[in-house]
Amino acid sequence: IVHNPAVHVHDLSAKELYKSFFGIMNTGRWSRPFSYLSFAVNYHFGGLDVFGYHLVNFTIHCLAAIFLFLLIYQTLELPLLRRDYARHAYSISLMASLLWAVHPIHVSAVTYIVQRMASMAALFYFMAMFFYVKARTSSGSRTRQIIFACCCGISAVMALASKENAAMLPASLFLYEILLIQGYRKESRWAYAAAAAAV
């Protein structure tokens, strides 16, 4: 951040934001543009004062925990799991998301400013999965399902533009679809095993 001129924006004009989003290309690399854009916005409002960066990191982590809660809750409400888990879906989702949020493994992702990239990828990863589930299980109009599907696609792109480990998202959605939405079928167990092994 200190030595990267691409994030040292003077205002929030389209030209300056474009510089931060694509400026890394001038170094011969194009990587994590959405993360660099967030650093640029941070720099615009607070310069190199670390407080603002830590505040944004903490906020992103909290939002990720919220969407993880929503994802788990929606999962436990699926027809395949509802009979066994719907009664305790809220408490299970809350406990699981809280344990994830306070787990020591996330300390560096929250406290190290540059590790915001990992937190942003996690946030948009959870968002993409949540919107996918909503799109697949929504009982509303076709338009509602399309909106959720578009939100899933946008979140997926933002996750990949935050950090490359989000490239595993399609595999996660595939396994989620065949195991939790369509449901495990004994006659297809070898196909499921092969898919899991591939992931």
Feature-to-residue mapping (PLM):
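Polytopic membrane enzymes that build or remodel cell-surface glycoconjugates and lipids
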Residues: 1-199
